[in-house]
Amino acid sequence: MDVRRITKNAILLALLCVTGMFAIPMGENIKVSLQLLTLFIIFGITDKLFDKILIPSLYLLLGLIAPIYAGFQVGITPTFGFVISFVIIAIPFHFLYKYIKLKEIFRYIIACTVSLFICYLFGSIFMAIYLNFSYGKALLISVVPYIAFDIIKIAICTVAIKLLPDSIKTAPRSEQHDQ
Protein backbone atom coordinates (compact mmCIF):
# COMPACT_ATOMS: atom_id res chain seq x y z
CA MET A 1 0.00 0.00 0.00
CA ASP A 2 1.51 3.30 -1.04
CA VAL A 3 1.40 6.66 0.73
CA ARG A 4 -1.35 8.06 -1.50
CA ARG A 5 -3.67 5.14 -0.75
CA ILE A 6 -2.93 5.24 3.00
CA THR A 7 -3.58 8.99 3.03
CA LYS A 8 -6.82 8.61 1.06
CA ASN A 9 -8.04 5.91 3.46
CA ALA A 10 -7.13 8.03 6.50
CA ILE A 11 -9.01 11.02 5.11
CA LEU A 12 -12.04 8.87 4.31
CA LEU A 13 -11.98 7.34 7.80
CA ALA A 14 -11.79 10.83 9.33
CA LEU A 15 -14.71 11.93 7.14
CA LEU A 16 -16.76 8.94 8.31
CA CYS A 17 -15.90 9.68 11.94
CA VAL A 18 -16.87 13.34 11.67
CA THR A 19 -20.06 12.93 9.65
CA GLY A 20 -21.07 9.84 11.59
CA MET A 21 -21.26 11.74 14.88
CA PHE A 22 -24.05 14.01 13.82
CA ALA A 23 -27.68 12.94 13.91
CA ILE A 24 -30.34 15.28 12.59
CA PRO A 25 -33.58 15.15 14.62
CA MET A 26 -36.53 14.54 12.28
CA GLY A 27 -39.32 13.99 14.75
CA GLU A 28 -40.04 12.13 17.94
CA ASN A 29 -37.30 9.52 18.48
CA ILE A 30 -36.17 9.75 14.85
CA LYS A 31 -32.64 10.96 14.22
CA VAL A 32 -31.10 10.69 10.79
CA SER A 33 -27.35 10.20 10.72
CA LEU A 34 -24.97 10.69 7.84
CA GLN A 35 -23.08 7.42 8.39
CA LEU A 36 -24.61 5.53 5.48
CA LEU A 37 -24.39 8.49 3.13
CA THR A 38 -20.69 8.87 3.86
CA LEU A 39 -20.09 5.13 3.79
CA PHE A 40 -21.71 4.70 0.37
CA ILE A 41 -19.61 7.55 -1.01
CA ILE A 42 -16.50 5.93 0.49
CA PHE A 43 -17.46 2.59 -1.10
CA GLY A 44 -17.94 4.36 -4.43
CA ILE A 45 -14.52 6.00 -4.44
CA THR A 46 -12.39 3.20 -2.99
CA ASP A 47 -11.29 0.79 -5.65
CA LYS A 48 -10.01 -2.07 -3.50
CA LEU A 49 -12.15 -4.46 -1.47
CA PHE A 50 -9.51 -4.32 1.27
CA ASP A 51 -10.03 -0.56 1.64
CA LYS A 52 -13.82 -0.93 1.65
CA ILE A 53 -13.49 -3.37 4.57
CA LEU A 54 -10.65 -1.55 6.36
CA ILE A 55 -12.30 1.86 6.71
CA PRO A 56 -15.55 0.69 8.38
CA SER A 57 -13.57 -1.83 10.47
CA LEU A 58 -11.41 0.95 11.89
CA TYR A 59 -14.54 3.06 12.39
CA LEU A 60 -16.13 0.21 14.34
CA LEU A 61 -13.03 -0.20 16.54
CA LEU A 62 -12.62 3.54 17.14
CA GLY A 63 -16.28 3.80 18.13
CA LEU A 64 -15.75 1.30 20.91
CA ILE A 65 -13.49 3.79 22.69
CA ALA A 66 -14.43 7.23 21.30
CA PRO A 67 -17.82 8.94 20.82
CA ILE A 68 -17.90 8.85 17.01
CA TYR A 69 -21.14 6.98 16.41
CA ALA A 70 -24.38 8.79 15.56
CA GLY A 71 -25.42 11.15 18.32
CA PHE A 72 -21.91 11.03 19.81
CA GLN A 73 -22.50 7.52 21.14
CA VAL A 74 -19.66 5.24 22.14
CA GLY A 75 -19.44 1.49 22.62
CA ILE A 76 -22.01 -1.21 22.11
CA THR A 77 -25.53 0.22 21.93
CA PRO A 78 -28.81 -1.13 20.51
CA THR A 79 -27.81 0.22 17.09
CA PHE A 80 -24.34 -1.38 17.11
CA GLY A 81 -25.55 -4.06 14.70
CA PHE A 82 -25.80 -1.41 12.00
CA VAL A 83 -22.15 -0.45 12.58
CA ILE A 84 -21.14 -4.12 12.39
CA SER A 85 -23.03 -4.38 9.11
CA PHE A 86 -20.94 -1.56 7.64
CA VAL A 87 -18.00 -3.97 7.52
CA ILE A 88 -20.10 -6.81 6.11
CA ILE A 89 -21.83 -4.80 3.37
CA ALA A 90 -18.48 -3.78 1.93
CA ILE A 91 -18.22 -7.21 0.29
CA PRO A 92 -21.52 -7.36 -1.63
CA PHE A 93 -21.20 -3.66 -2.48
CA HIS A 94 -17.75 -4.22 -3.99
CA PHE A 95 -18.76 -7.15 -6.17
CA LEU A 96 -22.08 -5.67 -7.28
CA TYR A 97 -20.50 -2.33 -8.14
CA LYS A 98 -17.48 -3.76 -9.93
CA TYR A 99 -18.86 -6.75 -11.79
CA ILE A 100 -22.50 -6.22 -12.80
CA LYS A 101 -22.73 -5.60 -16.54
CA LEU A 102 -24.68 -2.34 -16.42
CA LYS A 103 -23.90 1.36 -16.64
CA GLU A 104 -21.94 2.64 -13.65
CA ILE A 105 -24.84 4.62 -12.20
CA PHE A 106 -27.14 1.57 -12.19
CA ARG A 107 -24.42 -0.64 -10.67
CA TYR A 108 -23.97 1.95 -7.94
CA ILE A 109 -27.69 2.22 -7.16
CA ILE A 110 -28.05 -1.58 -7.06
CA ALA A 111 -24.97 -1.96 -4.85
CA CYS A 112 -26.25 0.70 -2.43
CA THR A 113 -29.77 -0.75 -2.31
CA VAL A 114 -28.68 -4.35 -1.71
CA SER A 115 -26.17 -3.17 0.90
CA LEU A 116 -28.86 -1.10 2.61
CA PHE A 117 -31.15 -4.14 2.95
CA ILE A 118 -28.29 -6.20 4.41
CA CYS A 119 -27.57 -3.33 6.82
CA TYR A 120 -31.24 -3.27 7.83
CA LEU A 121 -31.21 -7.03 8.38
CA PHE A 122 -28.10 -7.11 10.59
CA GLY A 123 -28.97 -3.95 12.48
CA SER A 124 -32.54 -4.94 13.29
CA ILE A 125 -31.57 -8.50 14.30
CA PHE A 126 -28.89 -7.13 16.63
CA MET A 127 -31.35 -4.63 18.11
CA ALA A 128 -33.97 -7.35 18.66
CA ILE A 129 -31.44 -9.52 20.50
CA TYR A 130 -29.88 -6.62 22.44
CA LEU A 131 -33.21 -5.21 23.66
CA ASN A 132 -34.99 -8.57 23.85
CA PHE A 133 -37.62 -7.36 21.36
CA SER A 134 -39.44 -9.31 18.69
CA TYR A 135 -37.86 -8.93 15.27
CA GLY A 136 -40.98 -7.12 14.08
CA LYS A 137 -40.75 -4.54 16.85
CA ALA A 138 -37.05 -3.98 16.19
CA LEU A 139 -37.82 -3.54 12.49
CA LEU A 140 -40.53 -0.98 13.25
CA ILE A 141 -38.22 0.99 15.51
CA SER A 142 -34.92 0.77 13.66
CA VAL A 143 -35.80 0.48 9.97
CA VAL A 144 -39.28 1.63 8.97
CA PRO A 145 -38.90 5.30 10.06
CA TYR A 146 -35.64 5.59 8.10
CA ILE A 147 -36.50 4.03 4.73
CA ALA A 148 -37.44 7.31 3.02
CA PHE A 149 -34.36 9.07 4.41
CA ASP A 150 -32.11 6.23 3.25
CA ILE A 151 -33.58 6.37 -0.26
CA ILE A 152 -32.78 10.09 -0.31
CA LYS A 153 -29.24 9.32 0.91
CA ILE A 154 -28.75 6.84 -1.95
CA ALA A 155 -29.93 9.49 -4.43
CA ILE A 156 -27.52 12.06 -2.95
CA CYS A 157 -24.65 9.55 -3.02
CA THR A 158 -25.40 8.64 -6.61
CA VAL A 159 -25.25 12.28 -7.68
CA ALA A 160 -22.08 12.85 -5.62
CA ILE A 161 -20.32 9.83 -7.12
CA LYS A 162 -21.32 10.91 -10.62
CA LEU A 163 -19.95 14.43 -10.02
CA LEU A 164 -16.64 13.39 -8.43
CA PRO A 165 -13.67 13.39 -10.78
CA ASP A 166 -12.34 9.98 -11.82
CA SER A 167 -8.96 10.79 -10.25
CA ILE A 168 -10.60 10.56 -6.81
CA LYS A 169 -12.39 7.31 -7.62
CA THR A 170 -9.45 5.32 -8.97
CA ALA A 171 -6.36 3.77 -7.46
CA PRO A 172 -2.91 5.08 -8.37
CA ARG A 173 -1.67 3.65 -11.68
CA SER A 174 0.91 1.42 -9.99
CA GLU A 175 -1.82 -0.33 -7.96
CA GLN A 176 -4.52 -0.78 -10.60
CA HIS A 177 -3.41 -4.33 -11.36
CA ASP A 178 -3.83 -5.41 -7.69
CA GLN A 179 -7.09 -6.78 -6.35
Which stretches of residues belong to each language-model region?
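Interfacial aromatic-anchored transmembrane helix boundaries in multi-pass membrane proteins
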Residues: 20-31, 59-91
